């Protein structure tokens, strides 16, 4: 991880108005700095504003107070500046799995050979190499989510925003994907903001873990993960340091 800043958030506040005109404060005074190449996981109780924060960072919600200063303003021609993976199914139902990935690469300057390589490599990564000509309706919900993950990863984004991307996967596939994600991020040096309810997953993937309070969401604590980026997700879970941090984070989320 480098010390160069990717983005800085200052005094971010997000308010919703319900259909009954009640004002609900979702996020209150969040300030943080994320380094280039850092993987930041966000934990917190349900409804604390984790997904709202991610949508603001993604530029999908511009109705907020505070400032977001982006240092990442331009990407190389073979990489996307930013990509998102959310919980909802985002596959294009009229396109095959392969075309879902290809359309994600269409705005980049890549040779046909490189496009094919990225499609094949990322479908293999998520275990869908044999389904490239299938349509989304022929896949399970978990498989469609893997298509969305592969589509985002294939763009080699400088910034990757992910909201519970592995939640729909079975336990075995989820662990395998965690290992593969750590390898990819070590290779591509992407900056990643990763929202999850799974504390073990947060420790497994992240350089730092941010814990939010109950609504309105504030930063309760930020903890560094005592493992290098070149990590074995199976071995690290047996480490005392892993279990201690997991227990510490669990207590903070429980009391948030």
Residue ranges and their predicted role:
Residues 66-78:
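Conserved ABC transporter NBD signature motif
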Residues 58:
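Helix-to-loop junction immediately C-terminal to a conserved catalytic motif
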Residues 95-103:
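Short coil-to-helix segment of the ABC ATPase nucleotide-binding domain corresponding to the Q-loop/switch region
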Residues 134-137, 155:
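Conserved signature/switch motifs of ABC ATPase nucleotide-binding domains
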Residues 102, 113-131, 183:
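Conserved ABC ATPase "signature" region
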Residues 43-45:
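The feature captures the beta-strand-to-loop junction immediately N-terminal to the Walker
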Residues 160-163:
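Catalytic Walker B motif of ABC-type/P-loop ATPase nucleotide-binding domains
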């Amino acid at each position: 991880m480098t010390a160069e800043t990717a983005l800085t958030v200052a005094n971010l506040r997000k308010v919703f108005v319900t259909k009954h005109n009640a004002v609900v404060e979702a996020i209150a005074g969040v300030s943080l700095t994320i380094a280039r190449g850092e993987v930041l996981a966000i934990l917190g109780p349900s409804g604390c504003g984790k997904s709202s924060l991610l949508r603001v960072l993604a530029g999908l919600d511009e109705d907020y107070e505070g400032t977001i200063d982006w240092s990442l303003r331009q990407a190389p021609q073979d990489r996307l500046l930013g990509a998102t993976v959310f919980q909802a199914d985002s596959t294009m139902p009229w396109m095959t799995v392969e075309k879902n990935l290809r359309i994600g690469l269409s705005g980049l300057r890549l040779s046909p050979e490189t496009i094919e390589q990225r499609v094949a490599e990322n479908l293999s990564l998520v275990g869908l190499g044999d389904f490239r000509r299938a349509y989304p309706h022929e896949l399970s919900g978990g498989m469609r989510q893997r298509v969305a993950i592969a589509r985002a990863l294939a763009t080699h984004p400088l910034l990757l925003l992910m909201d519970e991307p592995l939640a729909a996967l079975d336990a075995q596939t989820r662990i395998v994907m965690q290992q593969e994600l750590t390898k990819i991020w070590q290779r591509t040096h992407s900056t990643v903001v990763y929202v999850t309810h799974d504390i073990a997953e947060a420790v497994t993937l992240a350089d730092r873990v941010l814990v939010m309070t109950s609504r309105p969401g504030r930063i309760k604590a930020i903890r560094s993960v005592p493992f290098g980026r070149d990590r074995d997700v199976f071995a690290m879970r047996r480490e005392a340091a892993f279990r201690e941090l997991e227990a510490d984070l669990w207590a903070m989320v429980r009391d948030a």
